[in-house]
Amino acid sequence: MNQWEELQESVGFDFQNVELLQQAFTHSSYVNEHRRENVKDNERLEFLGDAVLELTVSDYLFNKYPDMAEGHMTKMRAAIVCEPSLVEFAEAVHFSKYVRLGKGEEKAGGRTRPALLADVFESFIGALYLDNGIDKVVKFLERVIFPKIDAGAYLQTVDYKTQLQEIVQRDRDVLIEYDILGETGPAHNKAFDAQVIVNGQVLGKGSGRTKKQAEQSAAQFAINQLTHR
């Protein structure tokens, strides 16, 4: 089994055009050193993969969070498709071992360079889309990205207090108040408890290491209550 057969087995998809898969993992430095081989670098596939990734992640967020405001979905998507996240995804599926680099780039540590790994992940998405279609891209993301979204890995990018305000004020003017109920623990490791009150009714309680975190936690609880009635 060669490395490209191994890679296809690893990702769970067979490529009709294996050259497309190889191109996705070909850095421009490799092309510069192998001009006689008529190989192409992955930059065009990266361009396409970036767009496909934005679309598929946007679609997933749109359906998973039906009450989330556009601004919050935009922030969450940005956190998912940013370079550090893409590097994490690429490392999870061991993409670095398959990258084709020029000797100079290899010596310079290119195989572990974050920007390069992020680009490779996007170019793979582009190649997978061209060869297998959007449905197979979604299946791949269901293994690599969507479980992290489901686990709440990117919810810290969301301002729950603002989101709660947008939800409850859609149809009427309301008064939203936050109360700090108390604090526990020693001075160096305190925890605060908070509650959110909407028009005199307690909708949520939460705790956190700071007063702001406790209020955000209370707002998140209130949102869950409102959206799962």
Swiss-Prot record:
Assembly notes: Homodimer.
Protein's UniProt name: Ribonuclease 3
Residue ranges of every copy of the DRBM domain listed in the record: 159-228
Active site: 50, 122
Organism: Listeria innocua serovar 6a (strain ATCC BAA-680 / CLIP 11262)
GO process annotations (BP): mRNA processing; regulation of gene expression; rRNA processing; tRNA processing
Chief location category: cytoplasm
Gene name of the encoded protein: rnc
Keyword Magnesium applies: yes
A molecular-function term among this protein's GO annotations: double-stranded RNA binding
Cofactor(s) needed for function: Mg(2+)
Stored Pfam families: dsrm (PF00035), Ribonucleas_3_3 (PF14622)
GO CC terms of this entry: cytoplasm
